[in-house]
Structures are given as structure tokens and as C-alpha cells.
Regions:
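Short, functional N-terminal and low-complexity linear motifs
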Residues: 1-3, 22-23, 54, 140-150
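Histidine/acidic residue-rich metal-binding segments in metalloenzymes
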Residues: 3-15, 19-68, 72-100, 105-123
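Glycine-rich, acidic/polar active-site loops that bind/position phosphate-bearing ligands
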Residues: 125-203
């Protein structure tokens, strides 16, 4: 008889989900991050530094040595730019492992390597990845080791979407804005967020 695996126990074990954040983050930081996720509140760099540190420590505990801003360019497949947590050797022969809030929030891959649909000229090819905190980070393991994957949006330096996720996020924001306006007309004054979802129909 094969060994029994309790799916409920292992489900999400490699995801930096709400349960992990609540356990590892200081209460104030956790509260501010939840407000950012639910209401779009701006997150300070100081708070981002704390989140990045705890995310790094959690990932290292799971064997990760690198992190990547994980995004969906217009190629039809995902893309990653890998960076190491190792920043400098120490005099005692050890190494320093660090990950800052700035590195968590923003990355700068070579946008000229990805299609843009003619949105910009080659000399304007600069692009940025921006952390999407509404999607949880996760650790992915393969033959090369474990890596912390941080879901991000990918935009040009002038704000044009260069990926498949940014238009989706902007559409969800627009739907939420109008849905909240509508439910206010029906007397609902307490709801702060509308979460659109779409799924395949049963007959599909």
C-alpha cells in the first residue's frame, strides 16, 4: 500500500500566503500589507523592507538561494530574471544574504528582449517589473535548486503594459470602481472592495 499523503497538511506549504504572513510579520506591518492588498493603500519602503526580510528568511528555510520577479510578457509564456540573495563575502569566509524592500517592489529586466506590440521604439525599450502583492509569492523547486518567485506586473517606463497581467489588474480595478458606485446606489455603504472572478462554465 502506498504511503498516505494528507493533502490538507501540505496544501500551500510553499506559498507565502496569508497564514504565513500573519505568523511571521509584525502586527502593524501585516495590517498595512492587508490594506494594500484589499484597498490599494500605498506601502512605505520601511514596511516593504520588513516584508522582504521575512519573505527572504522564509524562502531560505525552504532552500532558496535566489529570487526572481516572475511575469507574463507578450510571448505567451512566463519570464523570470534571477538574482541571488548572496550580496557580499564576509571576512570570516561566510556570505551575507540580503533582500531589500526596494528589490521586492521593483525590478528592471531588459525589456528589449520582449515584444511590445509596437508600443515603443527600440531606444525606449526600458521596462520595469512591479510587485503585485495581490498574488502570493511562492518557492519553486527544480533540479537547479529552489527559488523565490515574486509575481509582478511588467510595464514600460512610460506606463504602457508589456505583459498579460497588467491589463487584467487594470480591468479588475475599473470593474470594482463602477461596481462600488452601483452598490452605493442600493444603500450599501460599508463594502470597500468588489472581487471579480471568471471561470469556465460546466458545459465547456
Amino acid at each position: 500500500m502506498s504511503e498516505y499523503t494528507n493533502v490538507a497538511e501540505i496544501f500551500g506549504e510553499d506559498v507565502f500566503n496569508d497564514a504565513v504572513m500573519q505568523q511571521r510579520l509584525p502586527k502593524k506591518v501585516y495590517k498595512d500589507l492587508k490594506q494594500t492588498i484589499l484597498e490599494g493603500k500605498e506601502l512605505s519602503l520601511e514596511m516593504a523592507d520588513v516584508i522582504a526580510h521575512e519573505m527572504k528568511e522564509w524562502a531560505i528555510e525552504k532552500g532558496a538561494t535566489h529570487y526572481t520577479h516572475w511575469f507574463q510578457p507578450l510571448t505567451g509564456v512566463t519570464a523570470e530574471k534571477h538574482d541571488s540573495f548572496i550580496t557580499a563575502p564576509l571576512p570570516n569566509g561566510k556570505v551575507l544574504m540580503s533582500f531589500s524592500g526596494k528589490e521586492l517592489i521593483k525590478g528592471e529586466p531588459d525589456a528589449s528582449s520582449f515584444p511590445s506590440g509596437g508600443l515603443r521604439a527600440t531606444f525606449e525599450a526600458r521596462g520595469y517589473t512591479a510587485w503585485d502583492c495581490t498574488s502570493p509569492a511562492f518557492v519553486r523547486e527544480d533540479d537547479g535548486g529552489a527559488i523565490l518567485c515574486i509575481p509582478t506586473a511588467f510595464c514600460s517606463y512610460t506606463g504602457e503594459a508589456l505583459d498579460q497581467k497588467t491589463p487584467l489588474l487594470r480591468s479588475m480595478e475599473a470593474v470594482q470602481e463602477q461596481a462600488l458606485r452601483l452598490i452605493r446606489l442600493f444603500g450599501n455603504t460599508t463594502s470597500r472592495k468588489v472581487k471579480p472572478s471568471v471561470g469556465v462554465e460546466q458545459e465547456y
